Amino acid sequence: VYLVGAGPGDYRLITLKGKECLEKADVVICDYLADKRLMAFAKDDVEYIYVGKKAGNHAMRQEDISQLIADKAKEGKCVVRLKGGDPFVFGRGGEEAEVLKKNNVAFEIVPGISSAIAAPAYAGIPVTNRKVAVSFAVITGHEDPTKGKSDINWEKLATAVDTLVFLMGVGNLPHITSQLIKYGRSADTPAALVRWGTKAEQEVLVTTVGNAVEDVKKHNLKPPAVFVVGNVVNLRQTIQWFDNKPLFGKNILVTRAREQASKLTTALEDLGANCIEAPAIKITTPDDDFASLDKAIAKIGEYE
């Protein structure tokens, strides 16, 4: 079993090792946040199992997912558990690894680029900067609901760290911001929410800790998004780059044959476009071994 980090969103940000694992997989057990275009790296006959979890809508319980991974491996299959971001950064990869260990199933961890760093980067927000931020912390915005109380030490967290990055925190934003302000973080502290970071549909909302809740409602910003708090947010004014691309925000339908589409798609994506491949033609060898083509070429002189 390979517990593979799919990266922060853009399918091309998966690691080389992650791509190699997909290429040899017999079974891919996939998360909601893992881009489906990654399946292009897999074999044609790969078994694809979706186990994604959205807020209030879970395809499968975590306990069942972990056991499914182990069961598929026990069938003698090469299994890739494809998880958004990094498996060990709020990805529950550790829990899955524990179950595999209990079932005597060999596994490897293939780290991925976390959205905690990549999403702010694509918004032009570095999580550290020598002049304004020498520390950062990554915090879950959605703790285990079965716990009796929060494990987050808000009193220390609010002021001890320069940059705070909350994952999965849109739904709990009122609680997060109120706790930060309560324990000493200024309501005027710059903040930003980055939705679908690194993807063509990326949205960036720049706000403050005090105004974040109201601004999210005003702009109807939905999950998934990372919430960044700190003076580094101001650097976006200078180093914003991704959403400045000429085709950013454009959806482009590519109708070329499958084998011809990839180069054009890549070029358009490099310019910021979101490409949808829908091949309208298929190039194949004719059934008559080119006899009809040869006949037409022989008569080419008759055409005006």
Where are these regions (language model features)?
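A contiguous loop/helix-start segment that scaffolds small-molecule binding in enzyme catalytic cores
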Residues: V1-L3, K74-V79, T140-R258, K263-T265
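Class I SAM-dependent methyltransferase SAM-binding "motif I" and its flanking Rossmann-like core
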Residues: D10, D86-A160, L205, F290
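A polyampholytic, Gly/Pro-enriched intrinsically disordered region
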Residues: D71-A73, P126-V138, V209-L221, K295-Y303
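Class I S-adenosyl-L-methionine
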Residues: V1-Y11, L16-I113, A118, K218, ...
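Short gly/pro/ser/thr-enriched loop/turn and capping motifs at secondary-structure boundaries
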Residues: K36-R37, A55-N57, S114-A118, S135-V138, ...
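Short hydrophobic/aromatic-enriched beta-strand-loop microsegments
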Residues: V46-K53, N104-E108, V127-A137, G184-L193, ...
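Surface-exposed, charge/polar-rich loops and edge strands
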Residues: A187, K245-E304
